[in-house]
């Protein structure tokens, strides 16, 4: 598969900042002009010039790019296209740049996800042999019945030294005039059996 059209010539240039090899398609009509090349990794600008002043054409083996610099043969009679950059550091070679995928941004879980996770854990702690599907269904019903912004209350009675959860988070505002309704079905069952 050829990525360069016949009216362009493909040259390879090494970025002077990050040392990445760049493939540059230079139009044949622009081979006599200086071409600006922008690196896709570090956004450094390099300049590609076909005939720098007072420099003889280099062979591909003499060029600092080594095997990556290919001769420009399509439009210029087998002369290589050297790279000229004002910030060239040929004395200090750098390690090749490794392209890494961007890291995913970790977001905090939503209120719904936090509630569901905690509720399923509570239900499974109270009833360890309940299937996850049923625990999820119960947690979803509890989400629909309660206001997740309020926390659950724990009450202690004098007759029982162990604390038990007897009421769910406070219901929505439209239920505020009614009695507080327990929304944790599993705890209702525990109270009846206990």
From Swiss-Prot:
Main localisation: nucleus
- Annotated region Disordered: the residues are 83-103
- GO annotation, biological process: carpel development; cell fate commitment; floral meristem determinacy; leaf development; meristem determinacy; specification of carpel identity; style development
Record's Gene Ontology CC terms?
Answer: nucleus
Disulfide links within the chain: none
Keywords, alphabetical = Developmental protein, Differentiation, DNA-binding, Flowering, Metal-binding, Nucleus, Zinc, Zinc-finger
Q: Where are the zinc fingers (C4-type)?
A: 15-42
Q: Where in the cell is it found?
A: Nucleus
Q: Which CDD domains match?
A: HMG-box_SF
Highest taxon of the source? Eukaryota
Record-level Gene Ontology MF annotations = DNA binding; zinc ion binding
The function of this protein is: Regulates carpel specification in flower development. Severe or intermediate mutation in DL causes complete or partial homeotic conversion of carpels into stamens without affecting the identities of other floral organs. Interacts antagonistically with class B genes and controls floral meristem determinacy. Regulates midrib formation in leaves probably by inducing cell proliferation in the central region of the leaf.
Stated family: Belongs to the YABBY family.
Protein name as catalogued: Protein DROOPING LEAF
Organism annotation: Oryza sativa subsp. japonica (Rice)
Give the gene name. DL
